[in-house]
Amino acid sequence: MPAAHSESMNKTKIAKIAFPIAALLCFFPFVSSAAALVLGIVLAVALGNPYVDKTRSYTHHLLSLSVIGLGAGMDLMVVGRVGLQGIGYTVVGISFTLLLGMLIGRMLKIERDTSTLITVGTAICGGSAIAAVAPTIRAKSHEVSVALGTVFMLNACALVIFPWIGHLLNLTQTQFGLWSALAIHDTSSVVGSTLQYGPESLQVGTTVKLARALWIVPVTFLIGLFYFRGQKVEGGAGKAKKPWFILGFLIAAALVTWIPELRPVGHVVETVAKRALVVTLFLIGANLTKETLKSVGIKPFLQGVGLWIVVASCTLGAILIGWIH
């Protein structure tokens, strides 16, 4: 048996043991959000991920359950107020990001579908938006992989960079929560980033991000109409995947708000949900395998980075001068 093949088999065996143990460790409070993400990336790059399909599926389901659990620790009245306040700048932000993203994609001569997926992932809520729009525009599997790989890498960067910038600029918890919700791609990374910054930041960031995620459905519908205008497409323009976990979040918040006796239980559920989110971040890191990193070409990555920098900078500037508050 060749030495290289033997070494590969040994790595796979070690990885099959190491990944479940690492995921279990992330449930404990001594593992931070950033540490969990880094641990997942290191294991994936060093050993490879023998559970790629499972970790992607678990990431989606665990994130949904965790977000619902976070609702059990929040006041519905506060959630409603914060969500309604964010409608105006959410509409402006999504529209601006979609237009700028498509412009950058054309300038860099990136495949139309890949550019659309990266843009919509940046504009709304990362991987969830990409997963919803991909079947609508009939995107090929490699185009979806490139878009997801780009977004996942930027999510990982955000978990480290955003809290550091927040502390450097002495942002308030509300300011940081708003900035994270409007400038970080995925809900999981928004929660991971704001979780490091403070409880008020977590509440604001989660609420505004979930309100933003609701735009998956209308934006996906409009993209479908734009792509196939003038064409008769069998089965329609595709169906958007509805973010049902947002409804679960609102129901959980309503229960603890309207039934005070449930609040002690709600706090326990919220605590467990926060730890589950740390595990989710580990799984996100575990999805950044060598294959994923190689699949992202330089042009799509430049589009993702350039668009993200502009969106994050403009949003931060608007928050600092008081346009967004």
UniProtKB/Swiss-Prot annotation:
Annotated InterPro entries: UPF0324_pro (IPR018383)
Main location: membrane
Entry annotated with the keyword Transmembrane: yes
Keywords: Cell membrane, Membrane, Transmembrane, Transmembrane helix
Membrane-related topology note: Multi-pass membrane protein
Location(s) in or outside the cell: Cell membrane
GO cellular component, one term: plasma membrane
Transmembrane regions: 21-43, 58-80, 87-105, 115-137, 144-166, 211-230, 243-260, 302-324
Family: Belongs to the UPF0324 family.
Protein name in UniProt: UPF0324 membrane protein Bd1437
